[in-house]
Amino acid sequence: MGIEQLSCPACGATFEMGLPRDVTVQSVTTEDREEPDDDRVKVRPNACSNGHECYVMFRF
């Protein structure tokens, strides 16, 4: 597991998220997303230090 530095799409604040190694972050949005049909793509919620919810989509 590695720690990724991501930017909040609402305010630009940096937040950290633990992600499996060798993943590619595909998007960080404020809109909730459903899990894709592809087993290699996951969506996980998180929040920045300002309390904005965001959703991180990544691919294994």
From Swiss-Prot:
Swiss-Prot/TrEMBL keywords: Activator, Metal-binding, Transcription, Transcription regulation, Zinc, Zinc-finger
Pfam families reported in the protein's UniProt record: Zn_ribbon_Brz
Zinc finger (C4-type): 8-52
Family: Belongs to the Brz family.
GO molecular function annotations of the record: zinc ion binding
Gene that encodes the chain: brz
Protein name: Transcriptional regulator Brz
Keyword Ligase in annotation: no
Presence of the UniProt keyword Metal-binding in the record: yes
Biological function: Activates transcription of bacteriorhodopsin (bop) and phytoene synthase (crtB1). May interact with DNA or RNA via the zinc finger motif.
InterPro entries associated with the record: Brz_Regulator
